[in-house]
A protein has these predicted regions:
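Signature of the SF2 helicase/ATPase Hel1-core->accessory helical subdomain module
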Residues: 176-177, 213-215, 222, 395-405, ...
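Conserved residues at beta->alpha junctions
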Residues: 170, 346, 420
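Proline- and acidic/polar-enriched loop/turn elements at helix boundaries
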Residues: 29-31, 371-372, 447
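Conserved helicase motor
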Residues: 346-349, 369-378, 394-399
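Conserved motor-coupling elements within RecA-like helicase/translocase cores
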Residues: 374-390, 407-408
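ATP-dependent helicase/translocase motor core
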Residues: 1-341, 350-366, 385-388, 395, ...
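A generic local structural motif
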Residues: 187-189, 329-331, 375-378, 401-405, ...
Length: 462
């Protein structure tokens, strides 16, 4: 049996790690009287969750080209509690503001109209932001059916005065599910204003740590034990015995650059009502694949073979492979300069439909974009155009027997994502695909262990 670890011990260990390892400032906001405003947060209303001084100074620093009155007016839009909206709708709206900024209009010194995006967070340079861990912050309840007057989260992680991460802790002898059922659920009901800006929630009793989104059910919360490598050996029994699960999550996700990367590129909404978070293996795997993409892209134009092979992204069955594709494509579109086209190739109608729907339902592709060709002829036409995304069955690369497959595009910024690329029965179709897209790069996704001939087939693709 693991030694008993109190909630306070877990909290203090986390704050120490956040301060000395992850680069956070730490603020203890506890007061004996919940209504006491003298808690160090700088708030003038206990219903507020934003830290006004931190928020304002960061916004002015990150947007020197925007007049101060315009900045302050924009921040008022962020502060709005959006009481007429559902919590998930409010969170989705603010998620867009955090990621893309707040659109503002103003006149410059010469009276010329200007339009800018006011940045709340600098996602490209962590050092330009302020990271703060606030513990024991009393918040006045605003929920219509609130069960208490005040609530006090254990730890909140702030970036530029904006609470992005909620952390609820329990003694090590308390079942972790109670942190979800008894705390997080009640907090969303009682202090919904805290979750309008929330990126994700963390629950821990040291023996076990899980994270999830504000829309996630308990069974959708997941662990985070690997730090840098999907192949890292994990001794779960030893981690539970030592009570270090939260330390591993902090090391793997709370480092400042990683936290910003996760919030910017690994959080999305599905059908506008379900908030989806990348799991541990997806975050590491997508970033590894993206690093390979950037490395291959840096090869000289003479090294065409190296540029065209992006490797294999291996997934266990049922571990969110199609969402990994979504995260991968979205991050490249957002972070890399280029006019990329992604062609997602599968061999079954159900897979093609599932992957397309996940791209569609996350807003990564639009219904009006006409990204699914109906037949081989339409596929060839699509690939000759400058579409951002195309989803197709490999069978649509069929061509008249004995005829040479035509070159459809010589662009070198086409990326073909091949699902289950080890399947060997499509050799001639794969040859047609390569002939039609001679300069494309290839990334293979598979959920099946590769052996012998299958490994060779996948190697030829990626």
């Amino acid at each position: 049996m693991p030694n008993f670890i109190s909630e306070d011990q877990i909290e203090q260990a986390l704050l120490q790690r956040l301060q000395h390892v992850c680069g956070f400032d730490v603020l203890n906001c506890h007061t004996a009287d919940p209504a006491d405003l003298n808690d160090g947060s700088g708030r003038i209303d206990k219903r507020d969750v934003l830290l006004p001084a931190h928020l304002t100074s960061a916004a002015l620093r990150l947007n020197p080209q925007i007049p101060e009155p315009v900045v302050l007016a924009a921040l008022a839009r962020l502060s709005d509690r959006r009481q007429a909206m559902s919590l998930v709708a409010a969170n989705r709206e603010v998620d867009g503001l955090l990621r893309d900024g707040i659109a503002v209009n103003f006149e410059d010194a010469q009276g010329r109209p200007q339009q800018e995006q006011l940045r709340l967070i600098d996602f490209n340079a962590a050092a330009n932001n302020e990271f703060l861990a606030a513990s024991q912050l009393w918040i006045k309840c605003t929920g219509i059916s609130a069960l208490a007057d005040y609530r006090r989260p254990d730890v909140l992680l702030y970036v530029n005065g904006i609470p992005l991460v909620f952390v609820e802790l329990k003694n090590s002898n308390v079942k972790l599910r109670s942190a979800y059922s008894d705390n997080l659920t009640n907090y969303k009901n009682d202090i919904p204003q805290l979750f309008i800006t929330n990126a994700f929630c963390v629950l821990s009793n040291a023996i076990e740590t899980r994270l999830g989104s504000l829309t996630g059910q308990w069974e959708h919360f997941f662990g985070w034990l690997r730090v840098n490598d999907e192949k890292e050996k994990i001794d779960r029994a030893q981690i539970a015995e030592a009570g270090t699960s939260l330390e591993r999550l902090a090391e793997g996700l709370f480092q400042r650059e990683r936290l910003l990367d996760y919030v910017e590129n690994f959080v999305l909404f599905h059908r506008e009502t379900n908030k989806i978070l990348a799991q541990n293996h997806q975050f590491i795997g997508v970033n590894h694949a993206l690093a390979q993409f950037e490395e291959r892209n840096a090869h000289s134009t003479d090294d065409k073979a190296a540029r065209r092979k992006l490797g294999v992204f291996w997934h266990t069955q049922g571990s969110g492979k199609s969402f990994s594709m979504v995260f991968y494509v979205r991050k490249i579109f957002r972070k890399l300069t280029g006019n990329f086209t992604f062609v997602v190739v599968t061999d079954r109608d159900d897979l093609d439909g599932q992957i397309y729907r996940n791209f569609l339902n996350t807003g990564t592709v639009k219904a009006q974009d006409a990204a699914q060709p109906k037949n081989s002829e339409e596929l060839r036409r699509f690939l000759g155009q400058n579409k951002r995304l195309v989803f197709t069955l490999i069978q649509k690369f069929r061509y008249a027997q004995g005829a040479t497959y035509p070159v459809l595009s010589e662009r070198d910024d086409i990326v073909v994502i091949v699902d289950e690329a080890h399947r060997t029965q499509y050799k001639s179709l794969a040859e047609n695909m390569r002939a039609g897209l001679p300069n494309a790069s290839y990334l293979a996704f598979t959920g099946t262990p590769l052996l012998g001939r299958e490994r060779k087939t996948t190697s030829s693709l990626a």
